[in-house]
């Protein structure tokens, strides 16, 4: 952090607004919004972060901010700034993603065409459709039923389509404007699923043709009826009211968000839009940013209704979308939202599963790593990382990979007990001594390789404890990061040397996953500990509020900020007596006192590998 940033951090207001991060070239690399600019912007330059946020922070050389009157105003400003500047670290929707529409042109002799551009030109647009193949299938069927003009410039004499009954030969046919309006209305009814009248007409024509011994013509009508039936089957009915609506669902895990949007048109689910991206703020805030960007895309027409999950601010979405916004509580609409959320979860799980798939590649990676380090194949790898903020709440974490895959049941967390102040070497000495002292005492199976998230100093400390103090023979390697906090090089040997390791190799990708995982696990534990300590300390001394009620409050509200903003009645609903709820509000809302930054962080008491070493 440079002196300019340090000075600016002191001047930040507590108002809502937008902040703009810039790199060394003055280029805007990230735009964000905040309810409290001081707390949010300072958080980037304090404490540990996950890999993606560290990469962002490493490029920040300057920042600006814009104060707004409200959170919603900040949200709208953020969306406009992102659209204007296209910062590389912000959420970006898929490029050039536009869906096809079927259009009846506004011409004297209308045509039925497929287009990806919706214009205010008097034409009638139907869609969007999931892809051009689906749109073409429907158009081919419409061409066989409705004789619209096919030629861009009508020829002076009748064309091929006239002879096969798919064109009225407008140069010789004297149909008036009312005729074409009527035909356009029939197309509209058909595309809305109101096709019973058309099927009845085709059945009548088929019967007349059969009676007249025109069997080929009767067979054509039969085929058309069957084609309509097939199309009906393909377009699954999701709602009985035949409304046009967009259904949003999202899911977050490991610093990533997946948003799924179901396009329901005329009660039929015609397509879904899937986007996965890393998020940097609270998930619900980044979700709102996504929605705002989504409807700025010209290809995304605003439907009659937009359905959103329960935890999203309805008023904020109303400010973004000129449509009816619903948070359904029950029924088929609630089922649609649940389905979108479920699909978002599945998509995100698939993303992470793909990283852990391919047994052959993973097995090959650990075998190659063993050959590279000249050690037996490291079937079991244990990796360590420390986390603290200026020496407060220092912790360490260990993750275990067996056969190249995370073994989460073997993960361990450590509260550093003997170190005072920010001493990373001493913390590493303590945790290595505790872990492998226990391995030695209890005759546990040692790992085939220890990987330290750190450089030469941390690795040498681990070697001293393992080899000199405990007399164990376990290979130890170090993973150093570059100035962008990315996995950079592998250290190994005696003395330590940089291992010649290709960045495109499977063994490099394996080490990268191990380093990212131990870093994530350590930071998650540290944040939980800080948040829990802050939470407990701010609510200490309130009569009637014991550990169980504190835990219930945190599980329900997720953060001190939300407890502070809650009404007494909302706190009572969690099972807290009214007199205690009133005491909580008095404690958290003293006149003029600001809430500490740590209260913004969310806490999850159900993290994996929740085991502590002695």
UniProtKB/Swiss-Prot annotation:
Where found in the cell? Cytoplasm
Q: Where is the composition biased (Basic and acidic residues)?
A: 599-614
**Organism field:** Streptococcus pneumoniae serotype 4 (strain ATCC BAA-334 / TIGR4)
Q: Which PROSITE patterns match?
A: GIY_YIG (PS50164), UVR (PS50151), UVRC (PS50165)
The entry sums up its family as follows:
Belongs to the UvrC family.
- A single GO BP: SOS response
Q: Which UniProt keywords apply?
A: Cytoplasm, DNA damage, DNA excision, DNA repair, Excision nuclease, SOS response
| Gene Ontology molecular functions | DNA binding; excinuclease ABC activity
Task: Give every UVR domain span.
Answer: 196-231
User: Where is it predominantly found?
Assistant: cytoplasm
Briefly state the protein's biological role.
The UvrABC repair system catalyzes the recognition and processing of DNA lesions. UvrC both incises the 5' and 3' sides of the lesion. The N-terminal half is responsible for the 3' incision and the C-terminal half is responsible for the 5' incision.
Renumbered to this chain, region (Disordered) spans 595-614
Quick one: which gene encodes this? uvrC
User: The GIY-YIG domain covers which part of the protein?
Assistant: 14-91
Protein name listed in UniProt: UvrABC system protein C
Subunit arrangement? Interacts with UvrB in an incision complex.
This protein's GO cellular component annotations are:
cytoplasm; excinuclease repair complex
């Amino acid at each position: 952090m440079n002196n300019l940033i340090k000075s600016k951090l002191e001047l930040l207001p507590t108002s809502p607004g937008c902040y703009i991060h810039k790199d060394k070239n003055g280029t805007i690399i990230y735009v964000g919004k905040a309810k409290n600019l001081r707390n949010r912007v300072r958080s980037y330059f304090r404490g540990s972060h996950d890999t993606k946020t560290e990469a962002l922070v490493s490029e920040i050389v300057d920042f600006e901010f814009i104060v707004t009157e409200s959170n919603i105003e900040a949200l709208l400003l953020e969306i406009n700034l992102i659209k204007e500047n296209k910062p590389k670290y912000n959420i970006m929707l898929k490029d050039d993603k536009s869906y096809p529409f079927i259009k009846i042109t506004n011409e004297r002799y209308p045509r039925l065409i497929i287009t990806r551009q919706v214009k205010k030109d008097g034409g009638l647009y139907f869609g969007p459709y999931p892809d051009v193949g689906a749109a073409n299938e429907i158009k081919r069927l419409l061409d066989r039923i409705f004789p619209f003009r096919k030629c861009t410039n009508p020829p002076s004499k009748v064309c091929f389509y006239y002879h096969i009954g798919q064109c009225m030969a407008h140069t010789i046919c004297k149909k008036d404007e009312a005729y074409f309006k009527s035909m356009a209305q029939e197309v509209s009814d058909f595309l809305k699923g109101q096709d019973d009248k058309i099927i009845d007409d085709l059945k009548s024509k088929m019967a007349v043709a059969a009676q007249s011994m025109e069997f080929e013509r009767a067979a054509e009508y039969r085929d058309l009826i069957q084609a309509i039936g097939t199309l009906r089957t393909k377009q699954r009915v999701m709602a009985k009211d035949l409304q046009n609506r967009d259904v949003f669902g999202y899911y977050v895990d490991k610093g990533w968000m997946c948003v799924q949007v179901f396009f329901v048109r005329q009660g039929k689910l015609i397509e879904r839009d899937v986007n996965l991206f890393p998020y940097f703020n609270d998930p619900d805030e980044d979700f709102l940013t996504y929605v705002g960007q989504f409807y700025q895309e010209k290809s995304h027409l605003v439907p009659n209704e937009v359905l959103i999950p329960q935890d999203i601010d309805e008023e904020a979405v109303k400010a973004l979308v000129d449509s009816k916004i619903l948070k359904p509580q029950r029924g088929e609409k609630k089922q649609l939202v649940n389905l979108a959320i479920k699909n978002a979860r599945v998509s995100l799980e698939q993303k992470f599963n793909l990283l852990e798939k391919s047994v052959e590649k993973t097995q090959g990676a650990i075998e190659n790593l063993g050959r590279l380090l000249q050690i037996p194949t490291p079937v079991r790898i244990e990796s360590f990382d420390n986390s603290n903020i200026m020496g407060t709440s220092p912790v360490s974490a260990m993750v275990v990979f067996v056969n190249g895959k995370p073994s989460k049941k073997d993960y361990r967390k450590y509260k550093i007990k003997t170190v005072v102040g920010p001493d990373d070497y001493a913390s590493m000495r303590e945790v290595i001594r505790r872990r492998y002292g226990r391995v030695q005492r209890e005759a546990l199976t040692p790992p085939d390789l220890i990987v330290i998230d750190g450089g030469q100093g941390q690795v040498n400390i681990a070697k001293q404890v393992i080899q000199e103090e405990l007399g164990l023979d376990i290979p130890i390697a170090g993973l150093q990061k570059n100035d962008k906090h990315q996995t950079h090089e592998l250290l190994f040997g005696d003395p330590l040397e940089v291992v010649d390791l290709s960045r495109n190799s499977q063994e490099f990708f394996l080490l990268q996953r191990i380093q990212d995982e131990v870093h994530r696990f350590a930071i998650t534990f540290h944040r939980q500990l800080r948040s829990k300590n802050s939470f407990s300390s701010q609510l200490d001394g309130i009569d009637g509020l014991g550990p169980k009620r504190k835990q219930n409050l945190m599980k329900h509200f997720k953060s001190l900020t939300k407890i502070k903003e809650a009404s007494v009645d909302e706190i009572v609903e969690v099972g807290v007596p009214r007199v205690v709820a009133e005491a909580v509000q008095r404690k958290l809302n003293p006149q003029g006192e600001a809430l500490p930054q740590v209260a913004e962080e969310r806490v999850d008491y159900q993290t994996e590998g929740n085991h502590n070493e002695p």
